[in-house]
Amino acid sequence: MGSSKDSASVTNISVEEHFSVSQSSPGGQFVGPTEEISTAAEALIGRSTTLTEALKAASMNVGHKPVETTDVAAIKEVETRAIGGDIESEGGVTAVASKAVARNQKIGKDNEKTNLGDVIAEIDVKVTRDREVTSEDAEAVIRAELNHSPFNNIIPGGVAESVAAAYKLNHDPSSL
């Protein structure tokens, strides 16, 4: 029997008003969360925010947590969109995050695992091109994080939420 993750599908993602996600599954439709974006975005107020700056905001918010598969999916989407194409298989932030997840799965203690902040710390060296966050970027990153989450949720203050907050700031700086 398949898991709920296998049978659920993301049908609508909107970052225009508030961050909201609609999903349908065999048990019905889930809509949520509809809430204000976290305060990680406060570091980005005052100018157009780029994709890598949104990653840095996530690092400030939840950088202490061990890197997980959901983070890798969201980071890959950000990195691909920032550079405008295929990412390097070995040298990019996605590769570093993937290796960290593989290492973390072998380690039992959370305090010994590689955390999100460690991975994102090298973003300026690893990603040499960048651009302003768009609604399409935010929606794609949210979708990537959701599709790789074992619980079909977004990490509060994580990569997807920080990218959505960056888009909201770019679109309407008075939204926070």
From Swiss-Prot:
Pfam families per the UniProt record, alphabetical: SMP
Keyword field contains Cytoplasm: yes
Quote the InterPro entries the UniProt record gives.
LEA_SMP (IPR042971), LEA_SMP_dom (IPR007011)
Keywords, A to Z, come to: Cytoplasm, Nucleus, Repeat
Report the locations given in the UniProt record: Cytoplasm; Nucleus
Principal place of residence: cytoplasm
Q: Which residues form the SMP domain?
A: 49-106, 115-171
Q: What's one GO-annotated cellular component? A: nucleus
What PANTHER family does the database record attribute to this sequence? LATE EMBRYOGENESIS ABUNDANT PROTEIN 49-RELATED, SEED MATURATION FAMILY PROTEIN
Q: Please describe what this protein does.
A: LEA proteins are late embryonic proteins abundant in higher plant seed embryos. The function of those proteins is not known.
Tell me the protein family, please.
Belongs to the LEA type SMP family.
Q: What is this protein called?
A: Late embryogenesis abundant protein 49
